[in-house]
């Protein structure tokens, strides 16, 4: 099946149309989820982008969902130090340091950083480096994306890195849908028919029920999506 000419970036362009108060707000909503990124997520991304990427314009699952704003990324300020401390590890994989720094600067601009303080000295933890992520989770109630088993062992709510593949698949499919929806609305009679169908759906009990489902439940459903299981 050929790739659609409609890129997932259309989501970012049209997202405001579907936000509360926007002209399409009553017709549908675009899924968006807050996720906390662990340092191992960023380090893996840096290694891929600087040593394995063949197409300079190619994007990883992570980068795409960040750029199209399907994922709103969060991290404790501690992550910055942890990532920069591991630049040498990435360079050791064959990357040029300047490429690592450039990609990190781009990624950092897509992450919301929160200072949650340091690790309490009077408490013992399985892995003290994971504490800032758990503290941030308690503050903003977002799931942590990590490959570190210690986070879950310390009662952190986690999801595997494979979730980004599922979220990218959603983003691409949703981009096609909203592009056709918006374009159809502006194309006269064809758009009017589509708009009527969407409006009927929006006013149905099904639509009302869907909008009441917490986003954490949607995330759990995405994690169980067949596309996600194929990437494990």
Feature locations, PLM:
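Active-site neighborhoods of divalent-metal-dependent phosphate/nucleic-acid chemistry enzymes
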Residues: 111-143
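Active-site flanking residues adjacent to catalytic metal/cofactor-binding acidic residues
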Residues: 37, 147-148
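Acidic, PIN/NYN-like endoribonuclease modules and their adjacent C-terminal/linker elements
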Residues: 150-232
């Amino acid at each position: 099946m050929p790739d659609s000419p409609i890129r997932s970036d259309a989501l970012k362009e049209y997202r405001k149309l579907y936000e509360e108060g926007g002209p399409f707000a009553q017709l549908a909503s675009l899924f968006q989820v807050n996720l906390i990124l662990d340092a191992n997520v960023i380090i893996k991304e840096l290694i891929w982008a600087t040593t394995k990427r063949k197409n300079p314009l190619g994007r990883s699952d992570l980068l795409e969902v960040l750029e199209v704003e399907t994922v709103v990324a969060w991290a404790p300020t501690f992550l910055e130090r942890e990532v920069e401390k591991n630049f040498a590890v990435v360079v050791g994989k064959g990357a040029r340091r300047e490429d690592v720094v450039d990609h990190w600067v781009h990624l950092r601009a897509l992450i919301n950083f929160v200072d949650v303080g340091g690790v309490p000295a009077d408490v013992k933890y399985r892995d003290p480096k994971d504490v800032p992520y758990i503290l941030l989770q308690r503050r903003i109630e977002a799931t942590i994306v990590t490959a570190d088993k210690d986070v879950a062992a310390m009662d952190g709510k986690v999801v595997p890195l494979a979730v980004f593949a599922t979220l990218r698949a959603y983003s691409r499919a949703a981009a096609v849908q909203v592009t056709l929806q918006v374009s159809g609305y502006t194309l006269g009679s064809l758009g009017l028919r589509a708009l009527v169908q969407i409006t009927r759906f929006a006013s149905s009990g099904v639509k009302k029920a869907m909008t009441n489902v917490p986003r954490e439940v949607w995330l759990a459903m995405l994690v169980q999506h067949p596309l996600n299981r194929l990437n494990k």
